[in-house]
C-alpha cells in the first residue's frame, strides 16, 4: 500500500556534477516496491553561481555525462515500470524583469540588493541577478543549451535504461506569471521576497499545477492508477484534506 509514499531528496544548490552522489541515497526496493515517478529537477544551478561571467557554468558535454551517470544510478534503484520526468533549467531573466524595480522588504530596490550581493561575491546567481542584460541573455542561452542536452538524452538514450521511461518538461515561468496576473494576482507574489530569487509558495503552487497538467496531457502513464486501498485508508485515518 503506497500511502503518502513521497520522498524529497532536494538539496539547495545541487547541480549535475554532484547529483549522482545524492542519488546513492535513494531508498527503493526494485523487487518489492511499486513503480516510482521521479521529478528530476536541477532548476538552474548549472548556470547559477556567484562568479562573474560564464566560466563556472557547466559545459554541455559535462552536463550530458553527469546526467547520464545519474540516470544510470536511478536505473539500479527504481522498480521496473518507473518514470523519470526531467525538468528543464529555467529562463531566469524573469527574476530581473519581475523584481528589479520593486522594493525589497528591507528597503532598497531588488536591483540594489542584487548589486550588493555581487559586490560581496555572494550572489546565488550572478548571471541572472545582474543589471547586465547581455549577461542575463547569455545565461539564458547557456541554460537552453543544457535543456537541449536533456532532449537529446530522452530522444537518443532512453533505450539504455530498463527500469524507467523518460519525458522532458520545460516550464515556462513567464507564461505562468502572466496567467497569474491575468487572474488578478501580482507578479511579485510568485518570487520569494526575502531573496528575490527562489519561487515563493505561490510560485511553487503554480509550477505544481502546470507540471500536473503536463503529466495529464503528455505523460499520463506516469500518474498511475488510483490506490486500490483508498477506501480502507479513509476508514482507518479519516479525511486528510485530499492527501
Regions of interest found by a model, annotated:
Residues 21-24, 61, 65-72, 76, ...:
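Solvent-exposed, polar/charged alpha-helical surfaces in well-ordered, non-transmembrane soluble domains
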Residues 116-243:
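Conserved catalytic region of serine esterases and O-acyltransferases that act on ester linkages
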Residues 1-72, 233-238:
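Conserved SGNH/GDSL esterase-like catalytic core that processes O-acyl groups on lipids
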Residues 24-28, 43, 72-80, 151, ...:
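Sec-exported extracytoplasmic/periplasmic mature domains
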Amino acid at each position: 500500500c503506497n500511502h503518502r509514499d513521497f520522498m524529497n531528496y532536494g538539496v539547495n544548490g545541487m547541480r549535475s556534477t554532484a547529483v549522482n552522489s545524492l542519488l546513492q541515497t535513494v531508498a527503493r526496493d526494485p523487487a518489492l516496491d511499486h513503480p516510482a515517478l521521479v521529478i528530476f529537477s536541477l532548476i538552474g544551478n548549472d548556470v547559477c553561481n556567484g562568479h562573474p561571467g560564464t566560466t563556472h557554468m557547466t559545459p554541455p558535454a559535462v552536463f550530458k555525462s553527469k546526467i547520464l551517470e545519474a540516470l544510470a544510478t536511478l536505473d539500479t534503484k527504481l522498480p521496473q515500470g518507473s518514470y523519470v520526468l526531467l525538468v528543464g533549467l529555467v529562463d531566469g531573466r524573469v527574476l530581473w524583469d519581475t523584481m528589479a524595480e520593486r522594493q525589497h522588504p528591507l528597503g532598497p530596490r531588488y536591483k540594489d540588493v542584487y548589486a550588493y550581493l555581487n559586490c560581496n561575491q555572494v550572489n546565488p546567481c550572478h548571471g541572472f541577478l545582474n543589471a547586465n542584460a547581455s549577461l542575463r541573455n547569455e545565461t539564458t542561452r547557456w541554460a537552453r543549451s543544457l535543456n537541449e542536452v536533456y532532449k537529446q538524452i530522452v530522444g537518443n538514450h532512453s533505450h539504455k535504461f530498463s527500469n524507467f521511461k523518460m519525458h522532458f518538461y520545460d516550464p515556462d515561468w513567464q507564461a505562468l506569471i502572466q496567467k497569474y496576473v491575468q487572474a488578478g494576482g501580482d507578479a511579485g507574489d510568485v518570487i520569494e521576497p526575502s531573496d528575490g530569487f527562489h519561487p515563493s509558495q505561490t510560485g511553487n503552487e503554480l509550477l505544481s499545477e502546470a507540471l500536473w497538467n503536463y503529466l495529464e496531457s503528455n505523460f499520463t502513464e506516469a500518474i498511475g492508477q488510483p490506490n486500490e486501498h483508498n477506501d480502507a485508508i479513509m476508514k482507518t485515518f479519516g479525511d486528510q484534506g485530499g492527501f
